[in-house]
């Protein structure tokens, strides 16, 4: 019997992206410079037109401009930046327009394939546009015809970035300033999926023809050892097999290896593209049916249906000489091939909990 989903007394809270935080703090700092007014909260307009008020931790003058900071509130989303101080330092001068700089804790792009050129601060296009729109409006309101130099920072961002995919993507020195809507939707996993897409794009842009999409550290280690692939070719897909397969329709590579634990691969084989236990479960009767197709006896089929886990089912099949790992990989391969272009050579690998291969198909 499945565990019951715990009840929550209230709906999950939405939060705000680092891009929204950067917009609010840069606007507050610029307003202080142009009007002398130091706000303790600031209203911004999100990309879809919503107006939100964001609290500030500080807004103050500095020797060469002004700075403002806010605490990132990701709502009920388990975001790595939740609770971090996001700040902006703004200086006036130069030609009209906004020039962006990476402050402490914000990374710099060092590889091709991302939405920004090499050498640029890792402040994504939508947050840049949000800041530019607000600062241009402020300049027009105040009759200011010069430019803005905006430096965005994240307190502790360099350490936080080690918990993200930024180092593998070639974003060094800190975090990225992200967001397309300005809002963090709880458990939407949009940032994780975006990092999967970026990983594929970076690999392609750097001439990598063979990528390996892996569910976790053990499968990454297995692929690295098996093929000698560099880190740039290893895509940490987690539970999001569909994010990899669907992105390859738009951005194909020559060869894709997918590797995961036997249980995860059995979910993909059954047609599930989100392998998390919240969204898909292991189908033991289906495993028994596939074992039958591979020659399993009635007794083995019954034992698989009654197994406590997929690992037990695999062990039972192996003891009877039934290659259930290969069978599962073959079904997973069919699912993948129905999604990716025919030009992509696909192969599947299943591993056990010790990282040993227990099945493959190509």
Swiss-Prot record:
Write down the Pfam families for this protein, in alphabetical order: CbiD
The UniProt keyword set, sorted, is: Cobalamin biosynthesis, Methyltransferase, S-adenosyl-L-methionine, Transferase
Read off the InterPro entries from this record.
CbiD (IPR002748), CbiD_sf (IPR036074)
Question: E.C. number, please?
Answer: 2.1.1.195
Q: Which reaction does it catalyse?
A: Co-precorrin-5B + S-adenosyl-L-methionine = Co-precorrin-6A + S-adenosyl-L-homocysteine
Q: Which GO terms describe its molecular function?
A: cobalt-precorrin-5B C1-methyltransferase activity
| Protein's GO biological process | anaerobic cobalamin biosynthetic process; methylation
- Is Zinc-finger one of the keywords UniProt gives this record? no
Give the pathway annotation.
Answer: Cofactor biosynthesis; adenosylcobalamin biosynthesis; cob(II)yrinate a,c-diamide from sirohydrochlorin (anaerobic route): step 6/10
Return the HAMAP family for the record.
Answer: CbiD
NCBIfam families with a match to the protein in the record: cbiD (TIGR00312), PRK00075.1-1 (NF000849)
Family per record? Belongs to the CbiD family.
Protein name per Swiss-Prot or TrEMBL: Cobalt-precorrin-5B C(1)-methyltransferase
Q: Which organism is it from?
A: Burkholderia multivorans (strain ATCC 17616 / 249)
């Amino acid at each position: 019997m499945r565990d019951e989903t715990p009840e929550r007394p209230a709906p999950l809270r939405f939060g705000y992206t680092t891009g929204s935080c950067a917009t609010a703090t840069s606007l507050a700092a610029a307003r202080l410079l142009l009007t002398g007014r130091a706000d303790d909260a600031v209203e911004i307009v999100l990309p879809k037109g919503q107006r939100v008020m964001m609290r500030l931790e500080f807004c103050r003058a500095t020797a060469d401009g002004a700075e403002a900071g806010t605490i990132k509130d990701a709502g009920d989303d388990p975001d790595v930046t939740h609770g971090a101080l996001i700040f902006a330092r703004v200086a006036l001068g130069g030609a009209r327009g906004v020039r962006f700089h990476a402050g402490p804790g914000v990374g710099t792009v060092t590889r091709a394939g991302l939405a920004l050129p090499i050498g640029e601060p890792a402040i994504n296009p939508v947050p840049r546009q949000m800041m530019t729109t607000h600062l241009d409006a402020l300049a027009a309101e105040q009759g200011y015809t010069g430019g803005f130099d905006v430096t965005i920072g994240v307190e502790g961002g360099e350490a936080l970035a080690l918990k993200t995919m930024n180092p593998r993507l070639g974003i060094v020195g800190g975090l990225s300033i992200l967001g397309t809507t300005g809002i963090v939707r709880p458990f939407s996993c949009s940032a994780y999926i975006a990092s999967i897409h970026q990983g594929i794009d970076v690999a392609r842009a750097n001439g990598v023809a063979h990528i390996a999409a892996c569910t976790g550290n053990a499968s990454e280690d297995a692929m690295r050892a098996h093929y000698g692939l560099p880190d740039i070719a290893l895509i940490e897909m987690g539970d999001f097999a569909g994010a990899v397969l669907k992105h390859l329709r738009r951005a194909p590579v020559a060869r894709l290896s997918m590797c995961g634990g036997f249980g995860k691969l059995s979910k993909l084989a059954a047609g599930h593209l989100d392998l998390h236990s919240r969204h898909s479960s292991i189908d033991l009767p289906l495993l028994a049916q596939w074992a039958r197709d591979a020659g399993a006896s009635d007794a083995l089929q019954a034992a698989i249906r009654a197994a406590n886990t997929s690992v037990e089912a695999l062990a039972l099949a192996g003891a009877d000489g039934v290659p259930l790992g290969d069978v599962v990989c073959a079904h997973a391969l069919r699912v993948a091939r129905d999604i990716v272009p025919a030009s992509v050579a696909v192969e599947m690998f299943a591993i056990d909990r010790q990282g040993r291969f227990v099945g493959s198909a190509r």
